[in-house]
């Protein structure tokens, strides 16, 4: 599925977070670690490069804001290769709260039992560019994965800065809020949750090889 960074600017969500962590609005002293979408590192279309530049300006403006800068893999491979998965996973595991737009990363975050917020702060008119399709972030909440996330009450949805502040403070004060719902969400999304998929995959491949060897005899 196409990423929502293509549908609408993500900057309002990021700016709201940067302002909150740099003010006295949050229950705990906080810092913001920003992970941009791979499309943000494209120079065409210009909208992604322009939004990337605005985000890096936030990093310069606010002392407690940091942007993850992946190393390009070279050629057409772009950014965020397989070796980046450990970093992404650790961000979800060790963050106090993960904030994203509606995203399948909510499923991955729930695996780590980390509180999560879907931020849908819109820019009026979207991209406001001729012939560039825009879709309000608030309109994608009924898409399959996102609707299941909302129905499970596995996290909170923030449609404006005040809702974002309140949800952040709730989780910063008590990380166990919605823990039961997060677990139920994962049980509904993922068939087996014993962290042994690698072992089972290897056992299956080995069983296929053994059957093939028996047929060859």
Protein language model features and the residues they cover:
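Catalytic binding pocket for nucleotide-activated donors in carbohydrate/polymer assembly enzymes
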Residues: 104-190
């Amino acid at each position: 599925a196409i990423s929502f960074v293509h549908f609408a600017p993500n900057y309002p969500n990021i700016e709201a977070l940067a302002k909150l962590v740099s003010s006295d609005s949050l229950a705990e002293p906080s810092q913001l670690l920003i992970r941009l979408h791979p499309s943000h590192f494209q120079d065409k279309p210009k909208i992604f490069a322009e939004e990337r530049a605005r985000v890096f300006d936030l990093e310069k403006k606010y002392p407690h804001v940091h942007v993850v800068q992946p190393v390009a893999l070279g050629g057409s491979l772009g950014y965020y290769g397989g070796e980046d998965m450990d970093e992404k996973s650790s961000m979800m595991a060790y963050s106090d709260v993960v904030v994203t737009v509606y995203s399948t990363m909510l499923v991955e975050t729930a695996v780590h039992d980390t509180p999560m917020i879907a931020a849908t702060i819109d820019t009026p008119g979207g991209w406001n560019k001729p012939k560039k399709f825009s879709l309000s972030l608030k309109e994608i909440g009924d898409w399959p994965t996102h609707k299941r996330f909302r129905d499970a009450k596995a996290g909170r949805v923030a449609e404006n800065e005040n809702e974002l502040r309140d949800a952040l403070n709730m989780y910063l004060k008590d990380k166990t809020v919605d823990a039961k719902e997060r677990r139920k969400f994962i049980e509904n999304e993922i068939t087996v949750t014993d962290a042994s998929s690698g072992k089972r995959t290897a056992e299956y491949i080995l069983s296929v090889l053994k059957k093939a060897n028996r047929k060859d005899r």
